[in-house]
A protein has these predicted regions:
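Catalytic machinery of carbohydrate-active enzymes
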Residues: 1-237
C-alpha cells in the first residue's frame, strides 16, 4: 500500500500499530497522534471541540492536493433492490413516513418509552395521517402502539438506511442515525446531551437539521424534551 489513513481522533490501540507494521505502507496519516509514535508519517492537529468531523476529509485532501469540493457531504451506498423494496413498503403505508429512533449508544442519551408514547401522541395530533416507523432491532419497545405506528419490519442496516433515505422526517438521539440522515439531507430532529466534545464534533452539520441540546441530566429524565421536539417539527410533512 502507498497510503494508509487512520481517521480515529482519540484511540490508538496497540493492535492498530502492529497492523501498520505488518502492512508496511509507505505513508500512514493520522490525527492528534503523539510525536513519539513513529508509525505515522504525518499527524494532523485536529481541534475536536471546535471542528466538525467532516473537516478530517478536508485536511486529508489538502495534504494530498486533491479537489476538496463536495467533501462536506457523506456518500452512503444502498443496493438498488433494497431501495425498491423499502419504497414499495412505504407506499403501502397511509401517510408520509416519519422514522423515529429512541435508542443511543448509551442509556443516558436514549429516550424513554414514556417519552416515546408522549411523542407519538403529540406528533400524530400535530400531523394526523402521518405514518411513524420505529427503529428497534433489539425489539425492546413494549408500549402499545396506535395503528399509524409500526416497528421497522426489516432486519438489515441497508434497509434502515433506505428507510431514512426515503422518509419525510427523522427523529433520533443516536449520531449514527443522524449522519445517515445527513447523507440524504433529510429533515431531522437530533437530540444530544450537553457534552461539548460531542455536540460540535458529531453535530448533524447541515441546514435541514435541528439539534436539541439537553442541558443537564439524562435524556430520558428530561420532562420537557417531547415539547421541544414537537416545537422543532416542520410545519408541513
Amino acid at each position: 500500500y502507498y497510503i494508509m489513513i487512520d481517521a480515529s481522533l482519540f484511540d490508538m490501540p496497540v493492535h492498530r500499530l502492529r497492523l501498520f507494521r505488518q502492512i508496511k505502507a509507505k505513508s500512514v496519516l493520522g490525527f492528534n497522534k503523539w510525536p513519539s509514535i513513529k508509525h505515522y508519517s504525518h499527524s494532523f492537529d485536529f481541534d475536536c471541540q471546535r471542528w466538525h468531523v467532516t473537516k478530517t476529509f478536508e485536511l486529508i485532501a489538502d495534504y494530498l492536493q486533491l479537489d476538496t469540493r463536495g467533501l462536506d457531504a457523506y456518500d452512503l451506498a444502498v443496493p438498488g433492490p433494497i431501495m425498491q423494496e423499502v419504497a414499495q413498503y412505504l407506499a403501502s403505508l397511509s401517510g408520509k413516513a416519519v422514522v423515529i429512533n429512541i435508542f443511543a449508544g448509551h442509556a443516558d442519551r436514549s429516550l424513554s418509552q414514556t417519552q416515546l408514547a408522549e411523542l407519538l401522541d403529540k406528533l400524530l395530533a400535530r400531523h394526523p395521517g402521518s405514518a411513524a416507523i420505529l427503529l428497534d432491532h433489539r425489539r425492546e419497545i413494549r408500549i402499545p402502539l396506535p395503528p399509524e405506528v409500526v416497528i421497522n419490519p426489516f432486519n438489515t442496516l441497508h434497509h434502515a438506511m433506505a428507510l431514512i433515505a426515503q422518509a419525510e422526517l427523522i427523529i433520533s438521539p443516536d449520531t449514527s442515525v443522524v449522519h445517515m440522515a445527513a447523507a440524504w439531507n433529510k429533515p431531522l430532529i437530533a437530540v444530544y446531551k450537553d457534552v461539548l466534545l460531542n455536540n460540535r464534533l458529531w453535530a448533524p452539520g447541515y441546514d435541514n437539521a435541528r439539534q436539541i441540546i439537553v442541558k443537564c441530566g439524562k435524556v430520558h429524565q428530561h420532562r420537557g424534551l417531547v415539547d421541544r421536539i414537537i416545537a422543532a417539527l416542520p410545519e408541513m410533512l
